């Protein structure tokens, strides 16, 4: 089941499945960071910003931007 990165609690691995339609500027920012569908993220913190790790790189996004990234939880 797909949800947004902003809805994931810390300690969870997720796979990026896509982006929410309607805000090309936000999607461009996310893509500029190198975050693409298929990436596996480990959420390190969920509040006040979403902090996650991709490989050996950590990122922090505000909840609005994290809410544009569609993910599924790893099982």
Model feature map: region roles:
Residues 1-7:
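An N-terminal amphipathic alpha-helical segment
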């Amino acid at each position: 089941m797909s949800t947004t990165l902003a809805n994931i609690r810390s300690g969870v691995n997720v796979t990026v499945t896509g982006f929410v339609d309607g805000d090309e500027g936000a999607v461009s920012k996310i893509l500029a960071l190198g975050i693409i569908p298929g990436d596996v993220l480990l959420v390190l913190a969920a509040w006040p910003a979403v902090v996650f790790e991709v490989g050996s790189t950590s990122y922090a996004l505000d909840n609005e931007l994290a809410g544009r990234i569609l993910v599924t939880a790893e099982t």
